[in-house]
From Swiss-Prot:
Cross-linked by interchain disulfide bonds around the DNA-helix. Keywords: Chromosome, Developmental protein, Differentiation, Disulfide bond, DNA condensation, DNA-binding, Nucleosome core, Nucleus, Spermatogenesis. It is found in: Nucleus; Chromosome. Protamines substitute for histones in the chromatin of sperm during the haploid phase of spermatogenesis. They compact sperm DNA into a highly condensed, stable and inactive complex. This protamine condenses spermiogenic chromatin in a pattern which comprises fibers with a progressively larger diameter and lamellae that finally undergo definitive coalescence. One of its GO terms (biological process) is chromosome condensation. This is Cysteine-rich protamine. The lineage of its organism: Eukaryota, Metazoa, Spiralia, Lophotrochozoa, Mollusca. GO terms for molecular function: DNA binding. One of its GO terms (cellular component) is nucleosome. It comes from Eledone cirrhosa (Curled octopus). Testis. It comes from the Eukaryota. Coiled coil: none annotated. Disulfide bonds join 16-24, 64-80.
């Protein structure tokens, strides 16, 4: 999540850890901790945008609409079909 640093392979670091601040989809607040998907292969660093630590009540981002079979990071046991 936003508080933890993204785990990246050495070849992914330049693409994944960009210095430019990106905006949270919902509240449009700029956050340097939002990380984009950095490489095509499935690995620990290849995750979609994380949530921004903003006080906005609608800060949660959609993680499972595009990949419904993927397990939700919050609910590891159950597969997430809604916003997580």
């Amino acid at each position: 999540f936003c508080g933890s640093k993204p785990r990246c392979r050495p070849r992914c670091k330049p693409r994944c850890r960009s210095r430019s601040k990106k905006r949270c989809r919902r509240c449009r607040r700029r956050c340097s901790r939002i990380v984009k998907k950095c490489c095509r292969r499935r690995s620990k660093c290849c995750r979609r945008r994380r949530r921004c630590p903003c006080p906005c009540p609608r800060k949660k981002l959609r993680c499972c609409k595009r990949r419904p079979k993927r397990r939700c990071p919050k609910r590891k046991k159950k597969r997430c079909r809604r916003k997580c």
